[in-house]
């Protein structure tokens, strides 16, 4: 706490002699909130970052005109890794340039048991670095509209599950989203190891995969980057 306060411009003398300001300035509040968001990848339980289940809506339209909602189930969580360990070689340098701190991964299966998706949370020191990395990833993948697997997160196999044989060679579609100091990557493949279907000949399958990946990665990114309550007092019980 002392280090954090002094970094915000509160002197050691003020802290030790009870002369701390009664309220944070707006700039100090914003900095504290940014620190809290950037620390979540370290402080939150893995099961909170990667929920056991979550819902998404595939492109299917029901007879009554409504949309279908399916549940994605988490198969397992991989060990924390570096960018070099958890991402493709072609993106490691651009992620490291932004100060990649770690990659957290989990693998899910979709509601029909057809698709596997590995989600990778890449943590950066701040939102500016994450945004720059996301822009570089988008340029590298041609905007994400490609029949090829865009470079990104590597598949995370989960022993004893339907994803025990999920490897990089089985990846079909990859993309990413960015929120706050995080870039959330995902990659999807078939659960039964069938051959890749070119997107230009099966656009519906591509839409199914991206609705799954976009929905899951966006929910994880939103939770990690949600704004915390505004702090008011530096260590005091009330202002």
Language model region names:
Residues 4, 27-30, 63-65, 73, ...:
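Localized chelating/binding microdomains
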Residues 60-114:
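Short, compositionally biased low-complexity segments enriched in polar/charged residues
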Residues 146-239:
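Extracellularly exposed regions in secreted/surface proteins, prominently low-complexity, repeat-rich
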């Amino acid at each position: 706490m002392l280090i954090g306060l002094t970094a915000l411009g509160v002197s050691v003398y003020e802290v030790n002699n009870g002369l701390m300001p009664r309220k944070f300035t707006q700039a100090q509040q914003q900095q504290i909130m940014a620190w809290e968001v950037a620390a979540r990848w370290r402080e939150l339980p893995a099961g909170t970052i990667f929920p056991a289940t979550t819902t998404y809506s595939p492109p299917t339209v029901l007879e009554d005109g409504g949309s279908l909602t399916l549940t994605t189930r988490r198969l397992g969580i991989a060990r924390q890794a570096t960018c070099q360990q958890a991402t493709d070689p072609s993106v490691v340098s651009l992620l490291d340039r932004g100060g990649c701190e770690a990659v957290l991964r989990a693998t899910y299966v979709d509601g029909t048991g057809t698709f596997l998706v590995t989600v990778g949370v890449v943590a950066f020191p701040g939102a500016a670095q994450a945004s720059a990395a996301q822009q570089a990833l988008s340029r590298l993948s041609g905007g994400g509209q490609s029949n090829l697997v865009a470079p990104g997160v590597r598949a995370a196999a989960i022993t004893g599950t339907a994803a025990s044989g999920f490897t990089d060679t089985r990846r079909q579609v990859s993309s990413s989203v960015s929120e706050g100091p995080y870039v959330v990557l995902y990659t999807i493949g078939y659960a039964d190891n069938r051959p890749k279907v070119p997107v230009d000949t099966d656009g519906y399958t591509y839409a199914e995969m991206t609705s799954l990946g976009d929905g899951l990665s966006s929910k994880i990114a939103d939770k990690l980057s949600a704004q915390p309550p505004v702090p008011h007092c530096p260590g005091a019980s009330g202002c």
